[in-house]
């Protein structure tokens, strides 16, 4: 039984390699706890990753910082980032935050949804590449 639980935990922690196009996901709301939802994947995936309507999914502030720390600028450098603030409810029904992410004079606004337990995004937002977690 322990092996089965350990194997399940490892599978749940695997990073996402491609955009999700169907099915339900688990979110963790500060007020409601964990719950399962079925997002409008067609509407979400019609927008670029990092848009307010397609925020980068992470788990809590450490997940936000971990994702942003893995981004790579065009020249190979590491971007600077700072939190701008919260921007209301996103497509998953939870609050999204925005970060300013800059490579020198080039800056982008990246929206993130931190209420996705056990989710690690492997895709970069437009304009960046990303290192493996």
Explain the meaning of each model-derived region.
Residues 1-6:
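Bacterial N-terminal signal peptides that target proteins for export
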Residues 13-15:
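N-terminal signal peptide c-region/cleavage motif recognized by signal peptidases
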Residues 19-95, 103-133:
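N-terminal secretory-pathway/extracellular module detecting exported/lumenal segments
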């Amino acid at each position: 039984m322990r092996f089965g639980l350990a194997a399940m935990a490892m599978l749940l922690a695997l990073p996402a390699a491609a955009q999700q196009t169907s099915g339900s996901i688990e979110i963790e709301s500060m007020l409601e706890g964990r719950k399962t939802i079925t997002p409008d994947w067609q509407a979400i995936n019609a927008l670029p990753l990092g848009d307010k309507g397609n925020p980068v999914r992470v788990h809590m502030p450490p997940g936000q910082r971990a994702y942003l720390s893995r981004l790579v600028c065009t020249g190979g450098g590491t971007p600077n980032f700072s939190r701008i603030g919260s921007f209301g409810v996103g497509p998953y029904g939870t609050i999204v935050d925005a970060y300013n992410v800059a490579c020198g004079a080039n800056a982008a606004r990246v929206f993130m949804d931190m209420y996705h337990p056990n989710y690690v995004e492997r895709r970069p937002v437009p304009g960046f590449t990303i290192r493996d977690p």
